[in-house]
Amino acid sequence: LKLMGIVKKVLGAL
């Protein structure tokens, strides 16, 4: 799983 990718996406959405 690419947790970092998901986290980056969430942070970018903020």
Swiss-Prot record:
The modification Leucine amide is found at L14. Linear cationic alpha-helical peptide that acts as antimicrobial peptide. Has antibacterial activities against both Gram-positive and Gram-negative strains. Has no activity against the yeast C.albicans. Shows moderate mast cell degranulation, as well as leishmanicidal activities (IC(50)=36 uM). Has no hemolytic activity. Its mast cell degranulation activity may be related to the activation of G-protein coupled receptors in mast cells as well as interaction with other proteins located in cell endosomal membranes in the mast cells. One of its GO terms (biological process) is innate immune response. It is found in: Secreted; Target cell membrane. GO terms for molecular function: toxin activity. It comes from the Eukaryota. Expressed by the venom gland. This is Eumenine mastoparan-EM1. Its main location: secreted. GO terms for cellular component: extracellular region; membrane; other organism cell membrane. Keywords: Amidation, Antibiotic, Antimicrobial, G-protein coupled receptor impairing toxin, Immunity, Innate immunity, Mast cell degranulation, Membrane, Secreted, Target cell membrane, Target membrane, Toxin. Belongs to the MCD family. Mastoparan subfamily.
